[in-house]
Amino acid sequence: MIRAIVTDIEGTTSDIRFVHNVLFPYARERLAGFVTAQQFVEPVKTILDNLREEIAQPAAGAEELIATLFAFMDEDRKSTALKALQGIIWRDGYVHGDFTGHLYPDVLPALEKWKSQGIDLYVYSSGSVAAQKLLFGYSDEGDITHLFNGYFDTLVGAKREAQSYRNIAEQLGQPPAAILFLSDIHQELDAAEEAGFRTLQLVRGDRDPASHHPQVQRFDDIHPEQIPA
């Protein structure tokens, strides 16, 4: 029996184009000015210190760090420091109504149904926990954060490494076979499966011929009660 569902965001609950065409450009446009203005103010000061440690350059100044952050964005590097800074910038955008977090229309009814069935719901995304809470707190459907029991980001590990999912299962206090992981990326599902999770792949477009995981197009095609644990 599935007792917990862990869902990805990009391409799963939300259109990846929202992240790449709205969120990323919004943060990129404001990053340099934000870091320059906030570099000595918490929490940005600590985030930049962590970035210096990440790149092994303890004496790096603001200009150098900004150049590094732009390079990370160009590479789509899953840097915890970059994700934290983006999250702070995005918060202003959400709060000021510059955008709302995209949700596919089939997502909320399914989440509410699973919650009513006693299934615990979690999020696991490469975006920071703060950014995840913003997307669901200021979503197209309003604030739906009350539906989730918890959130995980890269602090628990990389999404293509099986140990990350073992860490999640340990934190949830559930046997891996009682946890269903939803993602649009088969390599992430491979890692979750290696850790003992049940898996389902969301394919919002064409099917993924390289994947051996069960594939569905919508959240209302998912029936946790029919998945053996």
Curated annotation (Swiss-Prot):
One matching Pfam family: Hydrolase
Catalysed reactions listed for this entry: 5-methylsulfanyl-2,3-dioxopentyl phosphate + H2O = 1,2-dihydroxy-5-(methylsulfanyl)pent-1-en-3-one + phosphate
Keywords: Amino-acid biosynthesis, Hydrolase, Magnesium, Metal-binding, Methionine biosynthesis
CDD domains to which the protein is assigned, alphabetical: HAD_EP
Pathway membership: Amino-acid biosynthesis; L-methionine biosynthesis via salvage pathway; L-methionine from S-methyl-5-thio-alpha-D-ribose 1-phosphate: step 3/6; Amino-acid biosynthesis; L-methionine biosynthesis via salvage pathway; L-methionine from S-methyl-5-thio-alpha-D-ribose 1-phosphate: step 4/6
Cofactors that this protein relies on: Mg(2+)
Matching SUPFAM superfamilies: HAD-like
Chain segments carrying region Disordered: 206-229
Protein's job: Bifunctional enzyme that catalyzes the enolization of 2,3-diketo-5-methylthiopentyl-1-phosphate (DK-MTP-1-P) into the intermediate 2-hydroxy-3-keto-5-methylthiopentenyl-1-phosphate (HK-MTPenyl-1-P), which is then dephosphorylated to form the acireductone 1,2-dihydroxy-3-keto-5-methylthiopentene (DHK-MTPene).
Protein name: Enolase-phosphatase E1
Species in which this protein is naturally found: Klebsiella oxytoca
